[in-house]
């Protein structure tokens, strides 16, 4: 945890242990947030209380799993009803979230099929409001303006009203807390929108994207205050 502000921000990554780009993103985010000279980090620490989980699934990561923990469970299908036996990782984090509350949340992943950086939201939750949705779409627009590595044309199909899967963290947090929650997806090989023949989608680009996400969060918060 870090920060002196009252905006409760949760950043968490690698629910699926095979998606190592998520933890590279986290390294970039933590390098930014802990830099005493970084002006974006200083402003964010003044406005926010950050709760950061760099690796939600350390057992699965250590064992070389693709999508599951040591019990063989997909953690991102446990957020509606986590248990100590099947998903202690989610249980611990969600209990901590219940204590702090959540106002902004980003769940960091990688996608094998879509060669792009994109966000997935919470459109199908039962308590959806246009006002909450507008907060998410506004963050999308800010991030798209800040980095050419991000785009909004490609991504997952949007859930129909009332059909969101509440076992997934983004939907659960938006429904449970009224949070502006989102899932960030990155490619495995390269970003077709800005390909790099030498390195593809690299650890360095993951870390730079994290900095752009944090700068976007600061702009998003400043607009909220206006």
Predicted regions and their residues:
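Active-site/substrate-binding loop(s) of hydrolase catalytic cores
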Residues: 1-165, 171, 181-186, 192-199
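His/Asp/Glu-rich mid-to-C-terminal helical/loop segments that flank catalytic regions of hydrolases
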Residues: 193-226
